[in-house]
């Protein structure tokens, strides 16, 4: 009788094992498209056999635990490479926008406006007494000044957009770290019972990878299953159940940053002073946005300021000593910039010239009708070396900016594509290890179904044997 009971117990346990395996298969299939999900499997172990004399009678199998098929080294590698991809993607997008500012085909370009001004000065040298030609000079100069203003405005708008995106990313980071802290608690509570917290760990791993795409982080898992996450080298965002938000605040203008740029701060406690960790953020989307905003865009703004300042300085120095149509001198052509910084933003034709084109000087001598020597000097400024120790013209300086942004944008796009390929390969590798194959799961389902049927037949057989034994007792 005891052996029949044992056989029935083996069958019953086998039925339960098959049901568990089938349910796990169903869970895998249902999560085929769930991002970050790791395929799960039921680990079966041989049940403790029983001894009967010299015999060791097997007691079937039992489900020891449900584990996930996961490679933690690969997950960490994906997080690291994702950080590089986030950085490269942000830089590529931002540099693409800067490139559009200097796109000669779309905007005709500042180079075109610069050429028009010097062409107008040449026309003035051919007709030094003409008011119509002077009007053309004024309009060309005004259009050029507005082109400088436009480029400066578009570059600062790119910085403003970077600020907005940084603030948005920081809020997303805070939401993620809050969830990671909650998952830490769930993982610990579940695993205190000795049961692997598979789904919670999958979700936490996914959040860590997504977090790494936005900001460079370091994380480590403790023996209790909880992860500690730091950002910016010192800011502990998650430690066990606790979480600290990152903050965004406007900073005063300093060290090349314009006033009002957003910077990232960290508070260790509610009552502590916020610590600026902006300079420590070197990776992820925020790192890429900061690098372009604070370095690349500022470099191009400074380059445009240098060009606007030198243009106005050279033209004013020549124009102020010349004589206008009525023999007057001492007129500035452009409003004199206070300094190089902000010259492109504030460049404008002087009110004197805007109100009276007759005040545009063309002559080098007083009361000399037909004198075009000053107009020739003004038109010749196009070819005068005024940068790099007198070896580069205004055109050369501008073209160097255009060439540089093109090279930078191309390099950033290449970096993004290369990094995207690396991440893509790692994701494919992860999919081959941890991903769900529908064909494979269907094969397993059929196998477990057959096992279930066989187990049910075993239970029925044991039941029939028990019935036979009971009937013998009744006879």
Residue ranges with predicted function:
Residues 1-475:
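S/T-rich, low-complexity, solvent-exposed segments of bacterial secretion/appendage proteins
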């Amino acid at each position: 009788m005891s052996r029949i009971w044992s056989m029935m117990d083996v069958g019953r346990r086998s039925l339960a094992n098959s049901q568990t395996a089938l349910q796990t298969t169903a869970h895998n299939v249902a999560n085929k498209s769930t991002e970050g999900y790791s395929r799960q499997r039921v680990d079966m172990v041989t049940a403790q056999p029983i001894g009967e004399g010299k015999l060791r009678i097997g007691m079937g199998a039992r489900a020891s635990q449900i584990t996930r098929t996961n490679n933690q080294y690969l997950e960490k590698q994906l997080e690291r490479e994702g950080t590089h991809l986030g950085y490269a993607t942000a830089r590529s997008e931002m540099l693409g926008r800067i490139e559009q500012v200097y796109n000669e085909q779309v905007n005709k370009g500042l180079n075109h406006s610069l050429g028009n001004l010097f062409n107008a000065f040449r026309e003035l040298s051919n007709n030094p007494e003409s008011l119509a030609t002077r009007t053309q000079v004024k309009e060309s100069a005004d259009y050029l000044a507005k082109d400088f203003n436009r480029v400066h405005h578009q570059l600062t708008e790119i910085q403003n957009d970077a600020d907005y995106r940084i603030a948005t990313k920081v809020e997303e980071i805070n939401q993620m770290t809050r969830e990671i802290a909650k998952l830490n608690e769930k993982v610990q509570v579940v695993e205190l019972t000795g049961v692997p917290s598979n789904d919670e760990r999958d979700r936490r791993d996914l959040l860590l990878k997504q977090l790494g795409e936005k900001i460079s982080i370091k994380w480590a898992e403790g023996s209790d299953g909880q992860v500690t996450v730091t950002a910016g080298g010192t800011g502990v965002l998650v430690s066990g159940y606790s979480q600290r938000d990152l903050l965004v605040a406007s900073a005063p203008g300093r060290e090349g940053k314009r006033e009002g740029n957003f910077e990232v701060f960290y508070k260790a406690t509610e009552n502590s002073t916020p610590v600026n960790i902006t300079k420590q953020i070197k990776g992820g989307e925020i790192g890429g946005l900061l690098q372009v905003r604070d370095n690349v865009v500022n470099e191009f703004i400074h380059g445009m300021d240098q060009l606007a300042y030198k243009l106005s300085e050279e033209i004013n120095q020549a124009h102020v000593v010349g004589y206008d149509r009525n023999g007057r001198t001492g007129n500035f052509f452009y409003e004199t910039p206070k300094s190089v910084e902000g010259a492109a933003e504030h460049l404008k034709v002087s009110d004197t010239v805007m109100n009276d084109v007759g005040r545009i000087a063309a002559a080098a001598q007083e009361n000399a009708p037909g004198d075009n020597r000053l107009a020739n000097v003004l038109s010749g400024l196009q070819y005068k070396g005024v940068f790099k120790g007198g070896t580069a013209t205004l055109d050369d300086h501008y073209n160097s900016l255009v060439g540089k942004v093109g090279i930078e944008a191309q390099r950033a796009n290449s970096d993004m594509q290369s990094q995207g390929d690396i991440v893509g390969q790692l994701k494919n590798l992860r999919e081959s290890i941890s991903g769900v194959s529908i064909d494979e799961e269907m094969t397993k389902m059929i196998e477990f179904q057959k096992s279930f049927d066989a187990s049910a037949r075993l239970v029925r057989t044991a039941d029939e044997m028990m019935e036979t034994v009971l009937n013998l007792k009744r006879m």
